[in-house]
Structures are given as C-alpha cells and as structure tokens.
C-alpha cells in the first residue's frame, strides 16, 4: 500500500477479531488530510467495526483484538505507549443516534473541555460559541444555552454532538451514520456541514445511503464480508467501478 505525504491516517494489514471470529481481513486504507471518505457496504460488512478501530472504541469490547497497524500522523495508535484518552480527543466520534447528555446546551459542549481541566469561564464561553458556530447551530441555540439539550430537535441534537466533538479540537472526525435517524431537512444540514468541516478536519463517515456517499465524499471505500473490496475517488467509484461486486452493490443488486 502506498501511503502519500498527505496521509493523515492509514490502516495497513489490519485484522480485527471478536474472540475467534475474524471480522476484518487485511485492510489497507489511507485517509488524506481535509478529505471526506465514505465507508459503504451492506449491514454486517465490517465498516462500523473498522471505523471504531480508528479511535480504539473497540478496546471497550473485552474479547476483541487487533493485528496490523493504524497510524495517525505516522504513529501507530495501537502502540502500548499511546494515551487513549488523548487519541480520542484527536480522533473524535459522532454516533448514529444523537446522544446529548442530560445537561444544558452549554454544558454539553463544555463537557470535554472541563474533563481536560479547563476552568476559565471566559475561555469556556469562547470555545462553546466557536464550536456551536462551526456546527452551524449557534444562531438556533444562542438564546437557549442554559436550557436542557434534550429539548432540542433530533437534527439540532446531532449538530450539538458534532459541536461537542469539535470543542476539544480534534484533527479527525469519525461519523457513524450521523443522519440515519434524521428527517430529510436535518440530513441536508448535516451534509452541508460536512462540506464546511472538511476545510479543517479529515472526515470518515459510515453511511448506508449511496446518495449521501455520492454527495458528501471525495473518496469511497466499499466493504463486503469484512474485506475492503475497492476504494477510489467517489465520482469514479459511482460511475466506473472496477469490481463487479462494487457495481452490483452501488446499483442495488444486493444490499
């Protein structure tokens, strides 16, 4: 696998196991700076498992183990010396369903900063506003910062979760089907936001929607039965895929 000088992260020879079950087979994949990569494939193909390897969320599963390398800025994130808390700050994650804390809007965004020892009120206020602006949510909640985040709409809650991830200044943003639980208008806002965020972040998104992958990503990677079948520029993947399995999946012949 060729790793370019623009690579922010890469996986090389990655194997992942749940106990004796091998869920990922020899994955080689590079993520370049300021690009959006969509991971596609049918349910159970390994795309979400792979995504969770990128910030070691799978460490939370006792029977799991990893072989191979995942590197961030050239450093193996599975090296025993790696601070996993710091890794998850650098590689943030937004989940499928909005998961705001039962706290105020302000405290949801400030949470990660407080965990990292930030106490200065002025700095917290500045970072909360900046993060909400980056998540295209500030104008909708600026007068509701002390209200419960649970009172926001589903789309607003998901953008709040994005703001919460952005507040701790990540370098990579992982998104696991971030719009699957949202209506079309809220989905459009998330997709517009992804286009803006890629100017500052490297984004890796799992999606079941071929249309969404085509709209938001620069690169698409197709997974099937735990293997990376094909990867390439999204426009080419959706119009001239090299692999017959890729073509069959994208055209809806199986899923």
Swiss-Prot record:
Q: Which GO terms describe its cellular component?
A: plasma membrane
Q: GO MF terms on file?
A: ATP binding; ATP hydrolysis activity; ATPase-coupled phosphate ion transmembrane transporter activity
**What is the recorded name of this protein?**
Phosphate import ATP-binding protein PstB
**Has keyword ATP-binding?**
yes
Chain sites annotated for binding ATP: 41-48
Gene name, per UniProt, is: pstB
SS bonds (residue pairs): none
Q: What coarse category fits the chief subcellular location reported for this protein? A: membrane
Q: What is the role of this chain?
A: Part of the ABC transporter complex PstSACB involved in phosphate import. Responsible for energy coupling to the transport system.
Q: Which UniProt keywords apply?
A: ATP-binding, Cell inner membrane, Cell membrane, Membrane, Nucleotide-binding, Phosphate transport, Translocase, Transport
Could you tell me which InterPro entries the record lists for this protein?
AAA+_ATPase (IPR003593), ABC_transporter-like_ATP-bd (IPR003439), ABC_transporter-like_CS (IPR017871), P-loop_NTPase (IPR027417), PstB-like (IPR005670)
- Highest taxon listed in the record's lineage: Bacteria
Q: Which residues form the ABC transporter domain?
A: 9-250
Q: List the catalysed reactions.
A: phosphate(out) + ATP + H2O = ADP + 2 phosphate(in) + H(+)
Spell out the subcellular localization from the entry: Cell inner membrane
């Amino acid at each position: 696998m060729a790793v370019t000088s623009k690579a922010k992260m890469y996986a090389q020879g990655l194997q992942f196991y749940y106990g004796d079950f091998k869920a990922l087979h020899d994955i080689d994949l590079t993520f370049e700076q300021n690009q959006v990569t969509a991971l596609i494939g049918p349910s159970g193909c390994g795309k979400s498992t792979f995504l969770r390897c990128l910030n070691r969320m799978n460490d939370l599963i006792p029977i799991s183990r990893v072989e191979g390398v995942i590197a961030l800025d050239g450093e193996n994130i599975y090296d025993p010396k790696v601070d996993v808390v710091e890794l998850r700050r650098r590689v943030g994650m937004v989940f499928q369903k909005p998961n705001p804390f039962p706290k105020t809007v302000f405290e949801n965004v400030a949470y990660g900063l407080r965990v990292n020892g930030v106490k200065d009120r002025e700095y917290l206020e500045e970072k909360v506003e900046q993060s909400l602006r980056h998540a295209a949510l500030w104008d909708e909640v600026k007068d509701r910062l002390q209200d419960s985040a649970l009172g926001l709409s589903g789309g607003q809650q998901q953008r709040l979760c994005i703001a919460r991830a952005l507040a701790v200044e990540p370098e990579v943003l992982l998104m696991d089907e971030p719009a699957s639980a949202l209506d079309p208008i809220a989905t459009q806002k998330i997709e517009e936001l992804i286009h803006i965020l890629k100017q500052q972040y490297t984004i890796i998104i799992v999606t079941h929607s071929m249309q969404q992958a085509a709209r938001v990503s620069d690169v698409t990677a197709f997974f099937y039965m735990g293997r990376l079948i094909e990867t390439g520029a999204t426009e080419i993947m959706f119009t001239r895929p090299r692999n017959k399995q890729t073509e069959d999946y994208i055209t809806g012949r199986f899923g």
